[in-house]
Amino acid sequence: MKRPDYRALQALDAVIRERGFERAAQKLCITQSAVSQRIKQLENLFGQPLLVRTVPPQPTEQGQKLLALLHQVEMLEEQWLGDENSGSTPLLLSLAVNADSLATWLLPALHPVLTQLPIRLNIQVEDETRTQERLRRGEVVGAISIQPQALPSCLVDQLGALDYLFVASPDFAQRYFANGVTKSSLLKAPAVAFDHLDDMHQAFLQQNFGLSPGSVPCHIVNSSEAFVQLAKQGSTCCMIPHLQIADELKSGELIDLTPGLCQRRMLYWHRFAPESRTMRKVTDALLDYGRKVLKQDEE
């Protein structure tokens, strides 16, 4: 049986986390040459590349499996040695989450564990359709995703849903939708997407108005909070979680352009199995808070 050197695995992990050999070497307090040598030793042991040397570097399929193994071992070490290591460096938890969860409910949900446990968060923002892939690659130990099925050797629980409303400022609505929200008026109204793969706005318009993808003018802005600002200042119409704009809707600063219609995104919490004591507390915090603020199946 091939048994990897965990110092070499930590070097591989550092290169992926730090997005390069130089920063990985600084993080590990060794030379770049030493980082390269450790990874080369691993590759020789397994007889195949573990790293695609792109910018930034990416793990191969075998590299992903080894990173997942490392993270599971770290979780198990924390579980069995946590009390003895209570004064050591805080445990690093890398999580892949969607921007809207980060902007609304995630940080309040994590507040209890952040104040009670010695952990360091490494939050990686990704679309909820792609966060699970980061868990598959071993880049994170937990992910918030729309995928209901667990990966092999992983656990999954339903968190609840974010309901997205199609909103704009009253001024924007008057300029573009004075005669109602119609197919023709939507073709002229600028929208906004998080990135080029974010199709929520287009999917909503296609489903409810029959508009083909790509037919609406659309800004690209990588910030959930910026969506709210753009809508409030009358620059765009967009899909925003009700949870994020409840106050603006109540005050009339934003209006729901299509009352009765929403786009529901059910979210799931994925993580490696078995869970350590710390990870179990993170899971409990997310599930407890999610049940309070996110929409559940029966709602």
Curated annotation (Swiss-Prot):
MF terms (GO), sorted A to Z: DNA binding; DNA-binding transcription factor activity
DNA-binding residue intervals: 21-40
CDD domains, per the entry: PBP2_IciA_ArgP
Keyword terms, alphabetized: DNA-binding, Transcription, Transcription regulation
Superkingdom of the source species: Bacteria
InterPro entries for the chain: ArgP, ArgP_gammaproteobact, LTTR, LysR_subst-bd, Tscrpt_reg_HTH_LysR, WH-like_DNA-bd_sf, WH_DNA-bd_sf
One Pfam family cited in the UniProt record for this chain: HTH_1
Domain HTH lysR-type: 4-60
Keyword Transcription regulation: yes
Subunit text: Homodimer.
Record's function text: Controls the transcription of genes involved in arginine and lysine metabolism.
Similarity field: Belongs to the LysR transcriptional regulatory family.
Name the UniProt record assigns to this protein: HTH-type transcriptional regulator ArgP
UniProt lineage: Bacteria, Pseudomonadati, Pseudomonadota, Gammaproteobacteria, Enterobacterales
